[in-house]
């Protein structure tokens, strides 16, 4: 048995409800970092089919999810093709039904409202049944409360919740957030990460601050 979880394994534990997400993704426009997991008691491996909605890669939008993210059951990402044309009199998608309708009203991607990519940082916790809309960027260390609808960007290490999701609080002070962003613990090799785990799980933020400062000092001296 390996000393550390294998990021290339679909099911990292014996429960079968949690999968390391990058290993079940096939769409060319979806990227998921190491150790990010999706938890679902039914079919966690069907994430791409059930949780990434209206994903048409030819549309050009990307879904990028960082490392060590915790994605709860029912979280969904609404991709750009979900948006209807709003610049014309009717918003109805006539062309998708084929035949004469498609000939008379051919689809024009440039007429659709383009919101851009969905980008989720590292160590982000997305609560159960939350919905992330097109064009949203969620920063490192952020938390999205259960059943929230995220319509706008979320700053690193903040907590948002509601429909639409609103700022609830900043998790830490600016200095500690800057330290975390500089250390970027999610990029450490497994051996170094294991040594840092007591710090990452310590509620004593003063001790955490000292430890992270020491990490940066050691890096600067090598």
Features from the language model and the residues they span:
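Extended, small-residue-rich solenoid/repeat segments and analogous flexible loops
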Residues: 1-29, 94
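C-terminal segments of enzyme domains that contribute to small-molecule binding surfaces
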Residues: 2, 94-95, 102-132, 164-222
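Flexible, glycine/small-residue-enriched loop-and-beta-strand segment within the central core
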Residues: 20, 30, 37-132
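Beta-rich strand-turn-strand
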Residues: 118, 129-142, 150-151
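Conserved G/P- and acidic residue-centered "switch" motifs that form tight phosphate/ATP-binding loops
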Residues: 144, 162
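Short coil-to-beta-strand initiation/turn motif
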Residues: 148-150, 165
């Amino acid at each position: 048995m390996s000393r550390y979880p294998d990021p290339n394994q679909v099911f990292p534990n014996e429960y079968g409800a949690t999968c390391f997400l990058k290993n079940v993704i096939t769409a060319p426009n979806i990227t998921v970092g190491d150790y990010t997991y999706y938890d679902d008691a039914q079919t966690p491996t069907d994430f791409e089919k059930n949780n990434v909605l209206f994903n048409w890669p030819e549309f050009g939008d990307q879904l990028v999810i960082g490392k060590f993210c915790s994605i709860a059951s029912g979280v969904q990402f609404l991709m750009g093709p979900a948006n209807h044309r709003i610049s014309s009199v009717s918003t109805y998608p006539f062309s998708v039904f084929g035949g004469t309708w498609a000939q008379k009203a051919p689809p024009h991607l440039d007429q659709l409202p383009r919101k851009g990519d969905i980008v989720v940082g590292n160590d982000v916790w997305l609560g159960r049944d939350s919905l992330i809309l097109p064009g949203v960027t969620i920063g490192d260390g952020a938390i999205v409360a259960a059943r929230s609808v995220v319509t706008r960007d979320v700053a690193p290490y903040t907590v948002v919740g509601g429909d639409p999701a609103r700022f609830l609080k900043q998790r830490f002070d600016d200095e500690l957030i800057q330290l975390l962003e500089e250390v970027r613990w999610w990029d450490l090799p497994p051996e170094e990460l294991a040594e840092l785990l007591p710090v990452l799980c310590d509620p004593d933020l003063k001790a955490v601050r000292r430890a992270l400062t020491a990490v940066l000092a050691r890096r600067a001296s090598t």
